[in-house]
Amino acid sequence: MAKKSIGQLKLQVPAGAATPSPPIGPALGQRGINIMEFCKAFNAATQEMEKGAPIPVIITYYQDKSFTFSLKTPPVSFFLKKEANLKSGSKEPGKVSVGSISRDKIRSIAQAKMKDLNANDIEAAMRMVEGSARSMGLEVVG
Protein backbone atom coordinates (compact mmCIF):
# COMPACT_ATOMS: atom_id res chain seq x y z
CA MET A 1 0.00 0.00 0.00
CA ALA A 2 1.26 3.47 -0.89
CA LYS A 3 2.13 5.94 1.84
CA LYS A 4 -0.55 8.53 2.50
CA SER A 5 0.63 12.06 1.78
CA ILE A 6 -0.63 14.60 4.31
CA GLY A 7 0.75 17.75 2.73
CA GLN A 8 3.32 19.70 0.78
CA LEU A 9 5.64 22.47 1.85
CA LYS A 10 7.38 24.90 -0.50
CA LEU A 11 10.60 26.55 0.62
CA GLN A 12 13.44 28.45 -0.99
CA VAL A 13 16.72 27.32 0.56
CA PRO A 14 20.28 28.40 -0.36
CA ALA A 15 22.13 25.54 -2.10
CA GLY A 16 24.34 23.59 0.29
CA ALA A 17 23.30 25.76 3.24
CA ALA A 18 20.28 24.05 4.79
CA THR A 19 20.50 24.37 8.58
CA PRO A 20 18.01 23.62 11.37
CA SER A 21 17.80 27.33 12.20
CA PRO A 22 14.84 29.50 11.14
CA PRO A 23 13.10 29.58 8.75
CA ILE A 24 13.74 25.90 7.84
CA GLY A 25 13.66 24.35 11.33
CA PRO A 26 10.31 25.74 12.51
CA ALA A 27 8.62 25.10 9.15
CA LEU A 28 9.64 21.44 9.19
CA GLY A 29 9.33 20.89 12.94
CA GLN A 30 5.69 21.92 13.18
CA ARG A 31 4.87 19.34 10.52
CA GLY A 32 6.78 16.57 12.31
CA ILE A 33 9.51 16.26 9.66
CA ASN A 34 12.99 15.23 10.86
CA ILE A 35 14.89 18.51 10.41
CA MET A 36 18.43 17.12 10.46
CA GLU A 37 17.55 14.35 8.02
CA PHE A 38 16.16 16.92 5.57
CA CYS A 39 19.16 19.24 5.97
CA LYS A 40 21.64 16.42 5.28
CA ALA A 41 19.67 15.12 2.28
CA PHE A 42 19.16 18.63 0.83
CA ASN A 43 22.81 19.62 1.24
CA ALA A 44 23.92 16.36 -0.39
CA ALA A 45 21.51 16.89 -3.31
CA THR A 46 22.66 20.49 -3.87
CA GLN A 47 26.36 19.77 -3.42
CA GLU A 48 27.11 20.22 -7.14
CA MET A 49 25.12 23.46 -7.47
CA GLU A 50 26.46 26.98 -7.00
CA LYS A 51 26.79 27.64 -3.26
CA GLY A 52 24.23 30.09 -1.94
CA ALA A 53 21.95 29.96 -5.00
CA PRO A 54 18.31 30.04 -3.81
CA ILE A 55 16.84 26.64 -4.66
CA PRO A 56 13.05 26.20 -4.59
CA VAL A 57 12.24 22.86 -2.97
CA ILE A 58 8.87 21.12 -2.67
CA ILE A 59 8.71 18.78 0.33
CA THR A 60 5.95 16.15 0.41
CA TYR A 61 5.43 14.71 3.88
CA TYR A 62 3.59 11.56 4.87
CA GLN A 63 1.64 10.18 7.86
CA ASP A 64 4.59 8.06 9.01
CA LYS A 65 6.69 11.29 9.36
CA SER A 66 8.79 10.45 6.30
CA PHE A 67 9.23 12.89 3.43
CA THR A 68 10.38 13.27 -0.15
CA PHE A 69 11.51 16.43 -1.85
CA SER A 70 12.02 17.71 -5.38
CA LEU A 71 14.38 20.49 -6.37
CA LYS A 72 13.68 23.20 -8.94
CA THR A 73 16.12 25.51 -10.69
CA PRO A 74 16.96 28.89 -9.08
CA PRO A 75 14.57 31.78 -9.85
CA VAL A 76 14.98 33.78 -13.08
CA SER A 77 15.79 36.89 -11.02
CA PHE A 78 18.83 35.10 -9.54
CA PHE A 79 20.18 34.32 -13.02
CA LEU A 80 19.46 37.85 -14.29
CA LYS A 81 21.20 39.52 -11.34
CA LYS A 82 24.17 37.18 -11.76
CA GLU A 83 24.50 37.78 -15.52
CA ALA A 84 24.11 41.58 -15.21
CA ASN A 85 26.34 41.79 -12.08
CA LEU A 86 23.61 43.45 -9.99
CA LYS A 87 22.86 43.41 -6.28
CA SER A 88 19.15 44.16 -6.82
CA GLY A 89 16.72 45.31 -9.49
CA SER A 90 15.50 48.84 -10.15
CA LYS A 91 13.34 50.56 -7.56
CA GLU A 92 11.37 52.10 -10.45
CA PRO A 93 11.38 49.61 -13.35
CA GLY A 94 10.36 51.20 -16.65
CA LYS A 95 11.66 54.58 -15.53
CA VAL A 96 15.11 53.85 -14.10
CA SER A 97 17.30 51.30 -15.88
CA VAL A 98 19.90 49.51 -13.74
CA GLY A 99 21.72 47.82 -16.62
CA SER A 100 21.33 45.80 -19.77
CA ILE A 101 21.44 42.17 -20.78
CA SER A 102 21.97 40.60 -24.20
CA ARG A 103 19.61 38.23 -25.99
CA ASP A 104 22.33 35.54 -25.89
CA LYS A 105 22.33 35.65 -22.09
CA ILE A 106 18.51 35.65 -22.09
CA ARG A 107 18.61 32.50 -24.26
CA SER A 108 21.07 30.74 -21.92
CA ILE A 109 18.90 31.60 -18.89
CA ALA A 110 15.77 30.36 -20.72
CA GLN A 111 17.53 27.08 -21.57
CA ALA A 112 18.57 26.61 -17.94
CA LYS A 113 15.00 27.32 -16.71
CA MET A 114 13.16 25.47 -19.51
CA LYS A 115 12.16 22.43 -17.42
CA ASP A 116 10.51 24.63 -14.76
CA LEU A 117 8.83 27.15 -17.08
CA ASN A 118 5.37 26.69 -18.54
CA ALA A 119 6.60 27.14 -22.12
CA ASN A 120 6.39 24.96 -25.21
CA ASP A 121 9.54 26.20 -26.92
CA ILE A 122 12.68 28.21 -26.24
CA GLU A 123 11.24 31.38 -27.84
CA ALA A 124 8.30 31.44 -25.40
CA ALA A 125 10.69 30.83 -22.50
CA MET A 126 12.87 33.71 -23.73
CA ARG A 127 9.85 36.04 -23.76
CA MET A 128 9.11 35.09 -20.14
CA VAL A 129 12.72 35.78 -19.11
CA GLU A 130 12.69 39.09 -21.03
CA GLY A 131 9.54 40.12 -19.15
CA SER A 132 11.24 39.36 -15.84
CA ALA A 133 14.29 41.36 -16.96
CA ARG A 134 12.13 44.39 -17.84
CA SER A 135 10.31 44.09 -14.50
CA MET A 136 13.69 44.31 -12.76
CA GLY A 137 14.69 47.42 -14.71
CA LEU A 138 17.05 45.69 -17.12
CA GLU A 139 17.22 46.70 -20.77
CA VAL A 140 17.23 43.82 -23.28
CA VAL A 141 19.69 44.54 -26.11
CA GLY A 142 20.63 42.68 -29.27
Curated annotation (Swiss-Prot):
Coiled coil: none
GO biological process entries: translation
Keywords: Methylation, Ribonucleoprotein, Ribosomal protein, RNA-binding, rRNA-binding
Record PTM: One or more lysine residues are methylated.
GO molecular function: large ribosomal subunit rRNA binding; structural constituent of ribosome
A Pfam family hit: Ribosomal_L11_N
GO cellular component terms, semicolon-separated: cytosolic large ribosomal subunit
Segments passing through the bilayer: none
Similarity comment text for this entry: Belongs to the universal ribosomal protein uL11 family.
The protein's assembly and partners: Part of the ribosomal stalk of the 50S ribosomal subunit. Interacts with L10 and the large rRNA to form the base of the stalk. L10 forms an elongated spine to which L12 dimers bind in a sequential fashion forming a multimeric L10(L12)X complex.
Function as written in the Swiss-Prot or TrEMBL entry: Forms part of the ribosomal stalk which helps the ribosome interact with GTP-bound translation factors.
Name of the protein this chain belongs to: Large ribosomal subunit protein uL11
Organism: Bartonella henselae (strain ATCC 49882 / DSM 28221 / CCUG 30454 / Houston 1) (Rochalimaea henselae)
